[in-house]
Protein backbone atom coordinates (compact mmCIF):
# COMPACT_ATOMS: atom_id res chain seq x y z
CA UNK A 1 0.00 0.00 0.00
CA UNK A 2 1.15 3.51 -0.81
CA UNK A 3 -0.04 6.57 1.09
CA UNK A 4 0.01 10.14 -0.19
CA UNK A 5 -1.15 13.23 1.66
CA UNK A 6 -3.11 16.27 0.58
CA UNK A 7 -1.59 19.09 2.62
CA UNK A 8 -4.31 21.48 3.77
CA UNK A 9 -3.27 22.28 7.33
CA UNK A 10 -5.81 21.01 9.85
CA UNK A 11 -7.89 19.58 6.99
CA UNK A 12 -5.06 17.51 5.50
CA UNK A 13 -5.99 13.93 4.62
CA UNK A 14 -4.38 10.72 3.36
CA UNK A 15 -4.86 8.94 0.05
CA UNK A 16 -4.34 5.19 0.49
CA UNK A 17 -3.63 3.26 -2.74
CA UNK A 18 -3.33 -0.52 -3.00
CA UNK A 19 -4.98 -3.90 -3.54
CA UNK A 20 -7.66 -5.23 -1.20
CA UNK A 21 -8.05 -2.03 0.81
CA UNK A 22 -11.84 -2.45 0.96
CA UNK A 23 -11.26 -5.29 3.41
CA UNK A 24 -9.11 -3.29 5.85
CA UNK A 25 -11.29 -1.61 8.51
CA UNK A 26 -8.25 -0.10 10.22
CA UNK A 27 -7.87 2.28 7.27
CA UNK A 28 -11.40 3.64 7.74
CA UNK A 29 -11.95 3.54 11.51
CA UNK A 30 -9.72 6.55 12.36
CA UNK A 31 -11.77 8.68 9.98
CA UNK A 32 -15.29 7.75 11.18
CA UNK A 33 -16.48 10.12 13.90
CA UNK A 34 -19.64 8.40 15.18
CA UNK A 35 -21.51 5.11 14.89
CA UNK A 36 -23.75 6.14 11.99
CA UNK A 37 -22.45 5.55 8.47
CA UNK A 38 -24.32 6.17 5.22
CA UNK A 39 -22.87 4.46 2.15
CA UNK A 40 -23.95 6.21 -1.04
CA UNK A 41 -23.55 4.03 -4.12
CA UNK A 42 -25.38 3.24 -7.36
CA UNK A 43 -27.18 0.34 -8.99
CA UNK A 44 -24.03 -0.76 -10.83
CA UNK A 45 -21.46 -0.60 -8.02
CA UNK A 46 -23.65 -1.62 -5.07
CA UNK A 47 -24.15 -5.25 -6.20
CA UNK A 48 -20.37 -5.58 -6.56
CA UNK A 49 -18.99 -3.92 -3.43
CA UNK A 50 -21.70 -2.71 -1.02
CA UNK A 51 -21.97 -5.92 1.01
CA UNK A 52 -18.19 -6.23 1.17
CA UNK A 53 -17.81 -2.69 2.52
CA UNK A 54 -20.69 -3.23 4.94
CA UNK A 55 -18.88 -6.27 6.37
CA UNK A 56 -15.71 -4.19 6.73
CA UNK A 57 -17.77 -1.70 8.73
CA UNK A 58 -19.17 -4.32 11.12
CA UNK A 59 -20.06 -2.63 14.39
CA UNK A 60 -21.32 0.55 12.76
CA UNK A 61 -24.94 1.37 11.97
CA UNK A 62 -24.73 1.26 8.18
CA UNK A 63 -27.37 2.89 5.98
CA UNK A 64 -27.14 2.01 2.27
CA UNK A 65 -28.41 4.66 -0.15
CA UNK A 66 -28.41 3.29 -3.69
CA UNK A 67 -28.94 5.75 -6.53
CA UNK A 68 -29.53 5.25 -10.26
CA UNK A 69 -26.34 5.08 -12.30
CA UNK A 70 -25.16 7.72 -14.72
CA UNK A 71 -24.37 11.38 -15.33
CA UNK A 72 -28.01 11.97 -16.30
CA UNK A 73 -28.95 11.52 -12.62
CA UNK A 74 -26.43 14.02 -11.22
CA UNK A 75 -29.17 16.49 -10.35
CA UNK A 76 -31.32 18.00 -7.58
CA UNK A 77 -33.84 15.17 -7.66
CA UNK A 78 -31.23 12.49 -7.02
CA UNK A 79 -29.48 14.62 -4.41
CA UNK A 80 -32.81 14.86 -2.60
CA UNK A 81 -32.85 11.05 -2.39
CA UNK A 82 -29.68 11.18 -0.27
CA UNK A 83 -31.19 13.75 2.09
CA UNK A 84 -34.40 11.72 2.31
CA UNK A 85 -32.43 8.65 3.35
CA UNK A 86 -30.37 10.47 5.97
CA UNK A 87 -33.39 12.19 7.51
CA UNK A 88 -35.62 9.13 7.49
CA UNK A 89 -32.91 7.15 9.31
CA UNK A 90 -32.43 10.04 11.79
CA UNK A 91 -28.78 10.57 10.99
CA UNK A 92 -27.28 13.37 13.05
CA UNK A 93 -24.25 15.65 12.77
CA UNK A 94 -21.91 12.82 13.77
CA UNK A 95 -22.82 10.71 10.77
CA UNK A 96 -20.22 9.78 8.16
CA UNK A 97 -21.17 9.79 4.48
CA UNK A 98 -19.11 7.38 2.37
CA UNK A 99 -19.08 7.66 -1.43
CA UNK A 100 -18.71 4.20 -2.98
CA UNK A 101 -18.60 4.57 -6.75
CA UNK A 102 -17.34 6.75 -9.55
CA UNK A 103 -17.20 10.48 -10.08
CA UNK A 104 -20.95 11.08 -10.12
CA UNK A 105 -21.43 9.31 -6.79
CA UNK A 106 -18.42 11.06 -5.26
CA UNK A 107 -19.60 14.49 -6.39
CA UNK A 108 -23.17 14.00 -5.17
CA UNK A 109 -22.33 12.26 -1.88
CA UNK A 110 -19.75 14.95 -1.14
CA UNK A 111 -22.22 17.74 -1.89
CA UNK A 112 -24.81 16.04 0.31
CA UNK A 113 -22.24 15.77 3.12
CA UNK A 114 -21.37 19.45 2.71
CA UNK A 115 -25.03 20.46 2.98
CA UNK A 116 -26.52 17.98 5.45
CA UNK A 117 -26.94 19.73 8.80
CA UNK A 118 -24.39 22.25 7.46
CA UNK A 119 -21.65 19.68 7.05
CA UNK A 120 -20.93 16.11 8.16
CA UNK A 121 -17.93 13.81 7.85
CA UNK A 122 -17.16 12.52 4.36
CA UNK A 123 -15.06 9.63 2.99
CA UNK A 124 -14.24 8.86 -0.65
CA UNK A 125 -13.94 5.26 -1.89
CA UNK A 126 -13.66 5.70 -5.68
CA UNK A 127 -14.19 2.61 -7.83
CA UNK A 128 -13.51 3.96 -11.35
CA UNK A 129 -10.16 5.01 -12.76
CA UNK A 130 -11.43 8.53 -13.46
CA UNK A 131 -12.59 9.04 -9.89
CA UNK A 132 -9.45 7.46 -8.45
CA UNK A 133 -7.06 9.75 -10.33
CA UNK A 134 -9.12 12.93 -10.35
CA UNK A 135 -12.54 13.61 -8.88
CA UNK A 136 -12.08 11.91 -5.48
CA UNK A 137 -9.10 14.13 -4.63
CA UNK A 138 -9.43 17.84 -3.99
CA UNK A 139 -12.88 18.40 -2.53
CA UNK A 140 -14.87 19.45 -5.58
CA UNK A 141 -18.47 18.34 -5.10
CA UNK A 142 -21.70 19.21 -6.84
CA UNK A 143 -24.40 18.51 -9.35
CA UNK A 144 -25.19 19.49 -12.91
CA UNK A 145 -27.68 22.13 -14.03
CA UNK A 146 -29.50 21.86 -17.37
CA UNK A 147 -27.55 24.94 -18.52
CA UNK A 148 -24.11 23.82 -17.36
CA UNK A 149 -22.07 21.01 -15.86
CA UNK A 150 -21.04 21.18 -12.18
CA UNK A 151 -22.48 24.67 -11.82
CA UNK A 152 -24.02 23.98 -8.39
CA UNK A 153 -21.70 22.67 -5.69
CA UNK A 154 -19.17 23.26 -2.95
CA UNK A 155 -15.54 22.70 -2.06
CA UNK A 156 -15.72 20.04 0.67
CA UNK A 157 -12.72 17.87 1.47
CA UNK A 158 -12.97 14.20 2.48
CA UNK A 159 -11.28 12.91 5.62
CA UNK A 160 -9.64 10.06 3.68
CA UNK A 161 -9.54 8.70 0.12
CA UNK A 162 -9.35 4.90 -0.09
CA UNK A 163 -8.35 3.57 -3.53
CA UNK A 164 -8.65 -0.20 -3.90
CA UNK A 165 -7.10 -0.82 -7.31
CA UNK A 166 -8.75 -4.25 -7.63
CA UNK A 167 -12.10 -2.50 -8.10
CA UNK A 168 -10.92 -1.70 -11.62
CA UNK A 169 -11.19 -5.40 -12.49
CA UNK A 170 -14.97 -4.96 -12.80
CA UNK A 171 -14.78 -1.67 -14.72
CA UNK A 172 -16.13 -1.74 -18.29
CA UNK A 173 -13.52 -1.08 -20.99
CA UNK A 174 -15.19 2.17 -22.05
CA UNK A 175 -15.05 3.50 -18.47
CA UNK A 176 -11.39 2.50 -18.14
CA UNK A 177 -10.54 4.46 -21.28
CA UNK A 178 -12.49 7.44 -19.96
CA UNK A 179 -10.32 7.41 -16.85
CA UNK A 180 -7.16 7.31 -18.94
CA UNK A 181 -8.13 10.70 -20.39
CA UNK A 182 -7.56 12.30 -16.99
CA UNK A 183 -4.33 10.34 -16.49
CA UNK A 184 -2.96 11.57 -19.83
CA UNK A 185 -3.95 15.10 -18.83
CA UNK A 186 -1.44 15.08 -15.98
CA UNK A 187 1.38 14.21 -18.35
CA UNK A 188 0.39 17.01 -20.69
CA UNK A 189 0.04 19.76 -18.09
CA UNK A 190 2.83 19.12 -15.60
CA UNK A 191 4.86 15.94 -16.11
CA UNK A 192 6.38 15.26 -19.55
CA UNK A 193 8.35 12.20 -18.29
CA UNK A 194 5.04 10.73 -17.11
CA UNK A 195 3.62 11.29 -20.59
CA UNK A 196 6.53 9.31 -22.01
CA UNK A 197 5.86 6.55 -19.45
CA UNK A 198 2.20 6.48 -20.49
CA UNK A 199 3.17 6.08 -24.14
CA UNK A 200 5.22 3.05 -23.12
CA UNK A 201 2.58 1.53 -20.81
CA UNK A 202 -0.83 2.47 -22.25
CA UNK A 203 -1.39 -1.07 -23.53
CA UNK A 204 -0.58 -2.51 -20.09
CA UNK A 205 -3.00 -0.06 -18.50
CA UNK A 206 -5.79 -1.06 -20.86
CA UNK A 207 -4.97 -4.68 -20.05
CA UNK A 208 -5.54 -3.98 -16.32
CA UNK A 209 -1.94 -4.65 -15.34
CA UNK A 210 -2.05 -3.95 -11.59
CA UNK A 211 1.53 -2.72 -11.33
CA UNK A 212 1.07 -0.25 -14.18
CA UNK A 213 -2.30 0.92 -12.84
CA UNK A 214 -0.82 1.53 -9.40
CA UNK A 215 1.98 3.67 -10.86
CA UNK A 216 -0.49 5.67 -12.97
CA UNK A 217 -2.82 6.26 -10.03
CA UNK A 218 0.01 7.22 -7.67
CA UNK A 219 1.58 9.70 -10.08
CA UNK A 220 -1.78 11.23 -10.98
CA UNK A 221 -2.85 11.60 -7.34
CA UNK A 222 0.55 13.00 -6.37
CA UNK A 223 0.29 15.63 -9.10
CA UNK A 224 -3.23 16.60 -8.08
CA UNK A 225 -2.44 16.61 -4.35
CA UNK A 226 0.43 19.01 -4.96
CA UNK A 227 -1.75 21.40 -6.94
CA UNK A 228 -4.69 21.23 -4.52
CA UNK A 229 -2.38 21.89 -1.58
CA UNK A 230 -1.15 25.04 -3.30
CA UNK A 231 -4.54 26.27 -4.58
CA UNK A 232 -7.49 24.56 -2.93
CA UNK A 233 -10.23 26.81 -4.30
CA UNK A 234 -8.99 27.07 -7.88
CA UNK A 235 -8.04 30.73 -7.83
CA UNK A 236 -4.86 30.11 -9.81
CA UNK A 237 -2.73 27.10 -10.65
CA UNK A 238 -5.44 24.52 -9.87
CA UNK A 239 -7.40 25.72 -12.88
CA UNK A 240 -4.72 24.17 -15.11
CA UNK A 241 -6.13 20.77 -14.10
CA UNK A 242 -9.04 21.68 -16.37
CA UNK A 243 -7.13 21.23 -19.63
CA UNK A 244 -9.72 20.31 -22.26
CA UNK A 245 -12.60 20.65 -19.80
CA UNK A 246 -14.12 23.87 -21.13
CA UNK A 247 -14.49 22.37 -24.60
CA UNK A 248 -15.37 19.00 -23.04
CA UNK A 249 -18.08 20.32 -20.75
CA UNK A 250 -19.66 22.04 -23.75
CA UNK A 251 -19.78 18.65 -25.49
CA UNK A 252 -21.32 16.93 -22.46
CA UNK A 253 -23.95 19.62 -21.97
CA UNK A 254 -24.92 19.89 -25.63
CA UNK A 255 -25.08 16.15 -26.30
CA UNK A 256 -26.99 15.43 -23.08
CA UNK A 257 -25.38 14.35 -19.81
CA UNK A 258 -24.17 10.77 -20.07
CA UNK A 259 -24.25 10.44 -23.87
CA UNK A 260 -20.53 11.14 -23.88
CA UNK A 261 -18.68 9.97 -20.79
CA UNK A 262 -16.80 12.75 -19.01
CA UNK A 263 -13.42 11.30 -19.95
CA UNK A 264 -14.45 10.95 -23.58
CA UNK A 265 -15.50 14.59 -23.73
CA UNK A 266 -12.28 15.63 -21.97
CA UNK A 267 -10.22 13.73 -24.55
CA UNK A 268 -11.93 15.41 -27.51
CA UNK A 269 -11.82 18.74 -25.66
CA UNK A 270 -8.11 18.34 -24.97
CA UNK A 271 -7.47 17.71 -28.65
CA UNK A 272 -9.17 21.05 -29.29
CA UNK A 273 -6.99 22.70 -26.63
CA UNK A 274 -3.90 21.19 -28.25
CA UNK A 275 -5.03 22.48 -31.63
CA UNK A 276 -5.55 25.98 -30.24
CA UNK A 277 -2.16 25.89 -28.49
CA UNK A 278 -0.62 24.91 -31.82
CA UNK A 279 -2.44 27.69 -33.69
CA UNK A 280 -1.07 30.17 -31.16
CA UNK A 281 2.43 28.91 -31.90
CA UNK A 282 2.97 27.64 -28.35
CA UNK A 283 3.38 23.96 -29.22
CA UNK A 284 4.38 22.34 -32.49
CA UNK A 285 2.06 20.29 -34.66
CA UNK A 286 4.24 17.30 -33.75
CA UNK A 287 3.52 17.89 -30.05
CA UNK A 288 -0.18 18.27 -30.82
CA UNK A 289 -0.14 15.02 -32.75
CA UNK A 290 1.70 13.27 -29.91
CA UNK A 291 -1.24 13.94 -27.63
CA UNK A 292 -3.79 12.91 -30.24
CA UNK A 293 -2.05 9.58 -30.87
CA UNK A 294 -1.94 8.75 -27.17
CA UNK A 295 -5.64 9.46 -26.73
CA UNK A 296 -6.34 7.21 -29.71
CA UNK A 297 -4.22 4.40 -28.26
CA UNK A 298 -6.16 4.77 -25.01
CA UNK A 299 -9.39 4.05 -26.91
CA UNK A 300 -10.73 7.59 -26.69
CA UNK A 301 -12.54 9.83 -29.20
CA UNK A 302 -10.37 12.59 -30.63
CA UNK A 303 -12.97 14.27 -32.87
CA UNK A 304 -15.70 16.47 -31.34
CA UNK A 305 -19.32 15.76 -32.35
CA UNK A 306 -19.84 16.61 -36.00
CA UNK A 307 -23.23 18.13 -35.24
CA UNK A 308 -21.82 20.78 -32.88
CA UNK A 309 -21.39 24.18 -34.49
CA UNK A 310 -19.20 27.09 -33.45
CA UNK A 311 -22.26 28.78 -31.97
CA UNK A 312 -23.13 25.64 -30.00
CA UNK A 313 -19.69 25.62 -28.41
CA UNK A 314 -19.68 29.34 -27.65
CA UNK A 315 -23.15 29.22 -26.09
CA UNK A 316 -22.16 26.49 -23.63
CA UNK A 317 -18.65 27.81 -23.00
CA UNK A 318 -20.10 31.16 -21.94
CA UNK A 319 -21.54 29.34 -18.90
CA UNK A 320 -18.26 28.15 -17.43
CA UNK A 321 -16.74 28.59 -13.98
CA UNK A 322 -13.58 30.01 -15.57
CA UNK A 323 -15.45 32.97 -17.08
CA UNK A 324 -14.40 36.15 -15.23
CA UNK A 325 -16.06 39.50 -16.01
CA UNK A 326 -17.47 38.06 -19.20
CA UNK A 327 -14.07 36.94 -20.49
CA UNK A 328 -13.56 33.23 -21.14
CA UNK A 329 -10.31 31.92 -19.71
CA UNK A 330 -8.95 28.77 -21.32
CA UNK A 331 -6.38 26.23 -20.16
CA UNK A 332 -3.79 25.79 -22.92
CA UNK A 333 -0.26 24.41 -23.25
CA UNK A 334 2.84 26.59 -23.47
CA UNK A 335 4.73 23.35 -24.00
CA UNK A 336 4.30 19.70 -23.12
CA UNK A 337 4.41 19.63 -19.32
CA UNK A 338 3.48 23.30 -18.87
CA UNK A 339 -0.12 24.51 -18.84
CA UNK A 340 -1.40 28.05 -18.43
CA UNK A 341 -4.83 29.59 -17.92
CA UNK A 342 -5.31 32.67 -20.04
CA UNK A 343 -7.82 35.01 -21.61
CA UNK A 344 -5.08 36.61 -23.72
CA UNK A 345 -5.74 35.07 -27.11
CA UNK A 346 -7.13 36.41 -30.40
CA UNK A 347 -10.82 35.61 -30.76
CA UNK A 348 -10.21 34.50 -34.34
CA UNK A 349 -7.87 31.76 -33.09
CA UNK A 350 -10.61 30.41 -30.85
CA UNK A 351 -13.08 30.58 -33.72
CA UNK A 352 -10.66 28.74 -36.03
CA UNK A 353 -10.21 26.07 -33.36
CA UNK A 354 -13.96 25.57 -33.06
CA UNK A 355 -14.48 25.09 -36.80
CA UNK A 356 -11.32 23.08 -37.53
CA UNK A 357 -11.73 19.81 -39.45
CA UNK A 358 -10.60 17.36 -36.79
CA UNK A 359 -11.64 14.32 -38.79
CA UNK A 360 -9.33 15.35 -41.61
CA UNK A 361 -6.57 15.97 -39.07
CA UNK A 362 -6.94 12.47 -37.65
CA UNK A 363 -7.10 10.94 -41.12
CA UNK A 364 -3.85 12.71 -41.96
CA UNK A 365 -2.22 11.11 -38.91
CA UNK A 366 -3.31 7.67 -40.10
CA UNK A 367 -1.78 8.39 -43.48
From Swiss-Prot:
Cofactor needs: NAD(+); Co(2+); Zn(2+)
Keywords for the protein's UniProt record, in alphabetical order: Amino-acid biosynthesis, Aromatic amino acid biosynthesis, Cobalt, Cytoplasm, Lyase, Metal-binding, NAD, Nucleotide-binding, Zinc
Enzyme Commission code(s) on record: 4.2.3.4
A single GO cellular-component term on record: cytoplasm
MF term (GO), any: nucleotide binding
Cellular compartments annotated: Cytoplasm
Cofactor note: Binds 1 divalent metal cation per subunit. Can use either Co(2+) or Zn(2+).
Primary enzyme class: lyase
Residues that hold NAD(+) according to the record: 69-74, 103-107, 127-128, 140, 149
Pathway this chain belongs to: Metabolic intermediate biosynthesis; chorismate biosynthesis; chorismate from D-erythrose 4-phosphate and phosphoenolpyruvate: step 2/7
Amino acids binding Zn(2+): 182, 245, 262
A biological-process GO annotation: chorismate biosynthetic process
Catalytic activity: 7-phospho-2-dehydro-3-deoxy-D-arabino-heptonate = 3-dehydroquinate + phosphate
InterPro entries: Dehydroquinate_synthase (IPR050071), DHQ_synth_AroB (IPR016037), DHQ_synth_fam (IPR030963), DHQS/DOIS_N (IPR030960), DHQS_C (IPR056179)
Biological function: Catalyzes the conversion of 3-deoxy-D-arabino-heptulosonate 7-phosphate (DAHP) to dehydroquinate (DHQ).
HAMAP family the record matches: DHQ_synthase (MF_00110)
UniProt record similarity statement: Belongs to the sugar phosphate cyclases superfamily. Dehydroquinate synthase family.
Name of this protein: 3-dehydroquinate synthase
